[in-house]
């Protein structure tokens, strides 16, 4: 029986830097314009889908080159590997639910958990279309203003997990880990939201009165999840806001 499920964002959550921001800042229209574009997303005058597309369309570097650059530059949260290994030992599924691009996520995540373990992590994300000249564009997962409505993806998984419950069995505890605006819809689908300290998601949660628990690294997340599953603390006790 599955006692808990970890849903997590990827960029800026599993990674210490956001791969899409890095590509935009160094190969696209730069950090200043990116921040300007996302002001509109934060104040709801522009959809995440539109803002993200503007960022990516400013990058003209061939896709394989982008991957090589990211492999050298993007660091991964060292606590994630311990969390993943604990999850494997305790039959806790780990599902990456991302507004980024699957090929990038798969390459970077393989570097962290290893080729033999990557198939144990589900990745639900946008795809990439690459032409004969290695030019590329994002293919959004759905038609929503997010490009990928994470709440829909999470809801589908919840239905799958709960459909196998036997009489009297409790449903799993759903955890979500994130850092940005695109994580808000996902957060509302889960029992406990871990929001990265100092990032947009914390600001947004305070503005929208969404309960959350702040974290710095996955070491904090792992410690809190262990407390909940051991019955030492309730989800409500860990919530802030």
Curated annotation (Swiss-Prot):
It comes from the Eukaryota. Keywords: Cytoplasm, Hydrolase, Magnesium, Metal-binding, Nucleus. GO terms for biological process: alditol phosphate metabolic process; L-serine biosynthetic process. Disruption phenotype: Impairs the ability to metabolize cellular polyol phosphates which may build up to toxic levels in cells. GO terms for cellular component: cytoplasm; nucleus. Present with 12600 molecules/cell in log phase SD medium. This is Polyol phosphate phosphatase PYP1. It comes from Saccharomyces cerevisiae (strain ATCC 204508 / S288c).
């Amino acid at each position: 029986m599955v006692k808990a499920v970890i849903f997590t964002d990827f960029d800026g959550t599993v990674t210490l830097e956001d791969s899409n921001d890095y590509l935009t800042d160094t190969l696209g229209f730069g950090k200043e314009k990116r921040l300007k574009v996302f002001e509109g997303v934060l104040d709801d005058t522009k959809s995440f889908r539109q803002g993200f597309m503007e960022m990516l369309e400013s990058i003209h570097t061939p896709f394989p080159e982008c991957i090589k650059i990211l492999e050298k530059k993007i660091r991964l949260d060292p606590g994630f590997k311990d969390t993943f290994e604990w999850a494997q030992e305790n039959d806790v599924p780990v599902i990456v639910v991302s507004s980024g691009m699957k090929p990038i996520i798969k390459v970077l995540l393989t570097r962290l958990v290893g080729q033999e373990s990557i198939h144990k992590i589900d990745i639900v994300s946008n795809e990439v279309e690459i032409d004969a000249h290695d030019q590329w564009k994002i293919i959004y997962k759905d038609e929503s203003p997010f490009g990928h409505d994470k709440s829909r993806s999470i809801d589908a998984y919840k239905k799958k997990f709960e459909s196998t419950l036997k009489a009297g069995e409790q449903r799993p505890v759903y955890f979500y880990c994130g850092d940005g605006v695109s994580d808000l819809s996902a957060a509302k689908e889960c029992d406990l939201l871990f929001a990265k300290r100092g990032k947009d998601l914390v600001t947004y949660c305070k503005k929208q009165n969404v309960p959350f628990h702040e974290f710095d690294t996955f070491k904090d997340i792992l410690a809190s999840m262990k407390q909940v599953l051991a019955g030492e603390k309730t989800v409500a006790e860990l919530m802030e806001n």
